[in-house]
């Protein structure tokens, strides 16, 4: 049984809240990719209670990224739920110290699997 920490950001006011999802709701997230939108009703989350303000019921969560159990970040350009070492020059998982620097880094693919611990999502109205 998978359990995820989901960080939900509200772009209208800049507030982010972290919730924990487990059980059937977590099973619905497995197999989704970065960029996919999931209706909040499908997950059984009451966002109005979490954010303390009125959120429309037809709101969706757009998956923006996440990290696995060992802290490796998800990258949208690596397909599948696998972990892989790739040569990076910029983007999620790498901050160059010098201009033009490239380095091999371990990152996680763009698909949610049971090894993922944290999922970053943004509200879409």
UniProtKB/Swiss-Prot annotation:
The keyword Cell cycle does not apply. Belongs to the eukaryotic ribosomal protein eS6 family. The keyword Iron does not apply. GO terms for cellular component: ribonucleoprotein complex; ribosome. InterPro entries: Ribosomal_eS6, Ribosomal_eS6_arc. GO terms for molecular function: structural constituent of ribosome. It comes from the Archaea. GO terms for biological process: translation. This is Small ribosomal subunit protein eS6. Keywords: Ribonucleoprotein, Ribosomal protein. PANTHER family: 40S RIBOSOMAL PROTEIN S6.
């Amino acid at each position: 049984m998978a359990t995820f920490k989901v960080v939900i950001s509200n772009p209208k006011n800049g507030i982010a809240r972290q919730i924990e999802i487990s059980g059937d709701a977590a099973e619905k997230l497995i197999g989704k990719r970065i960029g996919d939108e999931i209706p909040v009703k499908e997950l059984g989350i009451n966002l109005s209670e979490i954010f303390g303000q009125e959120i429309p019921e037809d709101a969706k969560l757009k998956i923006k990224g996440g990290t696995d159990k060992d802290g490796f970040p998800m990258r949208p350009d690596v397909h599948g739920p696998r972990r892989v070492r790739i040569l990076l020059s910029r983007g999620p998982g790498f901050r160059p110290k010098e201009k033009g620097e490239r380095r091999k880094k371990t990152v996680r693919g763009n698909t949610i699997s049971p090894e993922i611990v944290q999922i970053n999502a943004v509200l879409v109205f």
